[in-house]
Curated annotation (Swiss-Prot):
UniProt feature, compositional bias: Polar residues: 459-468, 697-721, 740-758, 771-782, 789-803, 818-831
Membrane-crossing residue ranges in chain numbering: none
Lineage, top ranks: Eukaryota, Fungi, Dikarya, Ascomycota, Saccharomycotina
Gene: PKH3
Catalytic activity: L-seryl-[protein] + ATP = O-phospho-L-seryl-[protein] + ADP + H(+); L-threonyl-[protein] + ATP = O-phospho-L-threonyl-[protein] + ADP + H(+)
Residues found modified as Phosphoserine: S696, S753, S871
Domain of life, source organism: Eukaryota
Alphabetical keyword list: ATP-binding, Kinase, Nucleotide-binding, Phosphoprotein, Serine/threonine-protein kinase, Transferase
Protein's recorded name: Serine/threonine-protein kinase PKH3
SMART domains on file: S_TKc
Basic and acidic residues bias (residue ranges): 723-738
């Protein structure tokens, strides 16, 4: 290290090399020595502080400064560090060979010579790191670079820990619960990548030198097999495989070495490294004495650190040019990154581009969307960092989308006003289940509805209208303006022969190529498949791109509905109507066996593939036709067949999931809210029927009140008219109120004085026989609540009482044709409130479950609500206190209970 002060002005910044969790790496030239090439890591101060990355930057700087004191060929060297007002700068070795993972993806697997040579270099480098009291804690092929000659160089020490107390306190963490093993000082913080995490970190929340050796064993296996040994459908499954040693070479599996012979010595070496107990895991010194390295002279450092291209007389350029032109940034499917978060606001970066082949941080990758992860819940439970960041925070966030160029800011999955949009969507799916809709109806609405209603409406019309029709009519009376405008806008874009389906989220022309699953067939071909991974998909696309595009046959119209159902129709370009009218069901977004992959999918450039996989059933390669192909289709046909072409397909898939989750939450809320659906079901004792209620008018009866939790009925003395109240009617009788003789008799629709006795049969004959009132019934002064069902249920009566207490009794309006002006009635009731109302405790319960009208409750919020309010909860707060180990045990515990 030199003490001369440097600054960004001393360097010429070239192209961007990669993107890390909190930094961007550039190729740079020294202005004073142009022949010197460096890699400069630029860290945004604003982002570091915002994302709480100061700790990791300090760790990396201190660790690399310590290692740079004695330069080692296998360690990236730190030359200078400096900063300006906006950024921190790390001047590092330039590695023109790229990442080791990129080379592995190109080669598929390494032969025995390369495997032994790379492993020997890793062992020597790890021995040097451990000799300085440093644990890397995130060793994986992505964090190993290659120089021009093919030598390995370990990088990315942001997760490192040290047992040297001379370093920063954040860099070293000591565990007092040491078991006295050979790595007797361990770190107790959760870092690393899911597929390389050691079992002691999961089981005991400890990490030592043996954790790096475990990661080395995983890498040796990956060199030979092409993929890590432990790979689950999600992080929890991966962790379970790790602690169970569930991998092809594990003790419980029979090794099939006939198809592709593997050196048995390397199998034996991996089996001795991948051991659960740290005390039984072989050390680096024992690995060096293993028979697999019998021909390696560990004292001959020159031979060990000879580059692979150097030893074979090949240059880096010859090797890379000789490889097939396959995208090298393709990620292994289901490989999930645990610790990294995409950088977002580094000022010096002009064009955001993900770090090549970085897990969850690449633009040319297959991004896994396994529905069973839940996108947020599955990862949050494990303490993973990337999933806690919403996809809307930046258009280049690869947790949702991998190709940033394909999605402009106008097409982000959740726009800033997404909350209001979510409310509208939820109302469209189930408009009768949202409690906040009730208080919208105020006195003005009720007062205006009475004069418009004529008293002599024929009651026979109500009996001739079916229940289903009357309910929908009542619903449209409240929400018709917004619905009609929306339908007019949508139908205006369609052909006159077609009518739009409001349940369709998106519909457009695509190419679809389906490949069925066959257990005995090839791994992956155009005709069948029995295995899926990134290498197979990459090879298939590279060799059969035109066939998958299917551009010479016909187009399909792909339809995604709000119910989550995905289907398509064939649209033959020649005009064959037989295939066009047949609908083919593909899958439902809610299907737990459905996965979605993004292979360079870009809707703007119409390139790449959106891949859907139904587990052991079929794979669909979905691509978009070019604009020239679309121009051959008649304009009217395009207009009539495309819906919502302003929103991209990936966003619509996530929106469909969101709508389904919202519907599930609405179903949960409906079980605890006071809507008519929950209370319309019979329970014991049964509520008083409509036909029996007129007989009890004027008598004191005991009504049934529902508990807020499960809807059970309790006998409680209440006002005699509460059980028979229409929605938003006055819950009292003129006979029971003080001073009732001077009160207008129409205050209760069913309690009439002798002046109105003649109209009683006329009005009741029209209402009593029916289970659902018609539109005419509602316009007679009775505005429906919730789902506009009849008012015989107790749930609506309870809500009426809630509204009267919160807004005052003046919100209720009479509906009798002989009613005096509403102002008089309201003015008279104020000095004489109903006596039973102050005794009711329902408003407290309603506050517990209701939500503001502009907020949609997510499933996690709903569960937290009930967890915090449930005194008998089974959630163990002590277990899920810190780290991956705690999260793993907590999830294991919850899984056993299920």
């Amino acid at each position: 290290m030199t003490s001369r002060k440097r600054s960004p002005h001393d360097f010429i910044f070239k192209e961007e090399l990669g993107h890390g969790s909190y930094s961007t790496v550039f190729k740079a030239l020294d202005k004073k020595s142009p022949n010197k090439i460096y890699a400069i890591k630029v860290c945004s101060k604003k982002h570091i502080i915002k994302e709480a990355k100061v700790k990791y930057v300090t760790i990396e700087k201190n660790t690399m400064n310590l290692l740079a004191q004695k330069h080692h060929a296998g360690i990236i060297k730190l030359y200078y560090t400096f900063h300006d007002e906006e950024n921190l700068y790390f001047v590092l070795d330039f590695a023109p060979g790229g990442e080791l993972l990129s080379l592995l993806h190109k080669m598929g697997t390494f032969n025995d010579i390369w495997t032994r040579h790379f492993t020997a270099q890793l062992i020597d480098a790890l021995e040097f790191i451990h000799s300085h009291g440093i644990i890397h804690r995130d060793l994986k092929p992505e964090n190993v670079l290659l120089d021009r000659d093919g030598r390995l160089m370990i990088t990315d020490f942001g997760a490192a820990a040290t047992i040297d107390p001379s370093l920063s306190g954040d860099s070293a963490k000591f565990n007092s619960d040491s078991n006295g093993s050979k790595d007797n000082q361990n770190c107790a913080s959760f870092v690393g990548t899911a597929e390389y995490v050691s079992p002691e970190l999961l089981l005991y929340n400890q990490c030592g030198y043996g954790s790096d050796i475990w990661a080395l064993g995983c890498m040796i296996y990956q060199f030979v097999q092409g993929q890590p040994p432990f790979r689950g459908e999600n992080e929890l499954k991966t962790f379970e495989k790790i602690v169970a040693l569930d991998y092809p070479w594990g003790p419980n599996n029979r090794i099939n070495n006939s198809t592709s012979p593997i050196n048995p010595l390397v199998i034996n070496l991996v089996q001795k490294i991948l051991v659960i107990e740290v005390n039984e895991r072989i050390s680096l010194e024992q690995i060096k004495r293993h028979p697999y390295f019998s021909k390696v002279d560990w004292n001959d450092k020159i031979k060990i650190w000879r580059g692979i291209w150097q030893s074979q007389g090949q240059s880096l350029q010859q090797t890379t040019l000789g490889l097939p032109n396959i995208p090298q940034n393709i990620l292994p499917t289901r490989q999930l990154h645990v610790i990294d978060t995409p950088a977002r606001s580094i000022q010096i970066t002009k064009q955001k581009r993900k770090k090549p082949t970085k897990i969850s941080n690449t633009t040319s990758s297959i991004v896994v969307w396994r529905k069973r992860l839940g996108i947020s819940t599955g990862k949050d439970d494990l303490g993973t960092v990337p999933s806690t960041t919403p996809a809307v925070t930046a258009p280049n966030d690869t947790n949702v989308l991998t190709n940033t160029a394909a999605h402009s800011t106008a097409n982000i999955a959740l726009p800033p006003n997404s909350q209001s949009n979510q409310v509208k969507r939820a109302q469209l799916v189930a408009p009768n289940r949202i409690p906040p809709k009730v208080p919208v109806i105020n006195d003005n609405v009720r007062n205006k509805s009475i004069p418009r209603t004529k008293p002599n409406v024929p009651p026979l019309q109500t009996s001739s209208i079916p229940q289903k029709l009357s309910t929908s009519s009542a619903s449209s009376a409240l929400s018709a303006p917004s619905t009609e405008i929306r339908n007019q806008d949508l139908t205006h874009t369609l052909d006159g022969r077609n009518s739009i389906d409001i349940h369709v989220l998106k519909q457009d022309y695509v190419f679809i190529y389906g490949i069925p699953y066959e257990h005995e067939g090839p791994a992956m071909s155009l005709n069948s498949y029995n295995k899926i991974d990134n290498d197979l998909i990459t090879s298939l696309v590279a060799q059969h791109k035109e066939e998958l595009k299917n551009s010479e046959s016909f187009l399909q119209v792909l339809t995604l509905k709000k119910s989550g159902m995905l289907s398509y129709k064939n649209t033959v370009m020649e005009g064959n109507d037989d295939q066009e009218n047949k609908e083919h069901q593909m899958a439902n977004i809610e299907d737990t066996d459905l996965s979605m992959y993004d292979f360079e999918f870009n809707e703007l450039t119409r390139k790449g593939f959106l891949i859907l996989e139904k587990y052991k059933n079929r794979i669909w390669f979905i691509s978009l036709p070019s604009y020239s192909t679309l121009s051959k289709i008649p304009f009217n046909a395009v207009k009539s067949s495309t819906i919502n072409n302003n929103e991209n397909w990936v966003d619509c898939f996530f929106r469909a999931r969101q709508l389904l989750e919202e519907k599930q939450i609405l179903d949960k809320i409906s079980n605890v809210s006071f809507d008519s659906k929950a209370s319309s079901e019979p329970s014991s004792p049964p509520p008083i029927s409509r036909k029996e209620r007129p007989l009890s008018i004027g008598n004191n009866v005991t009504t049934l009140s529902y508990t807020a939790k499960n809807g059970s009925q309790n006998n409680a003395p209440q006002n005699d008219n509460v059980g028979e109240e229409k929605p938003f009617r006055i819950p009292s009788s003129t006979k029971d109120r003080p001073g009732a003789n001077s009160t207008p008799s129409s205050r209760h629709p069913r309690v009439l004085s002798s002046n109105n006795a003649g109209e009683t049969p006329k009005k009741m004959n029209g209402r009593l026989p029916n289970s659902a009132p018609s539109t005419n019934t509602y316009t007679n002064g009775s505005v429906p609540a919730f789902n506009h069902r009849p008012s015989t249920n107790v749930g609506n009566n309870k809500h009426n009482i809630l509204t009267s207490k919160k807004q005052g009794s003046s919100v209720f309006s009479p509906s009798s044709s002989t009613t005096k002006p509403q102002i008089k009635t309201t003015g008279y009731r104020q000095p004489t409130p109903s006596p039973p109302l102050p005794q009711m405790e329902f408003p407290t319960t309603r506050e517990k479950y209701s939500a503001p009208s502009n907020m949609v409750i997510s499933s996690s919020r709903y569960e937290v609500l009930h967890t915090l309010n449930n005194s008998q909860t089974n959630f163990d707060r002590e277990i899920a206190s810190r780290g991956a180990s705690a999260a793993f045990r907590s999830l294991q515990k919850s899984k056993k209970k299920k």
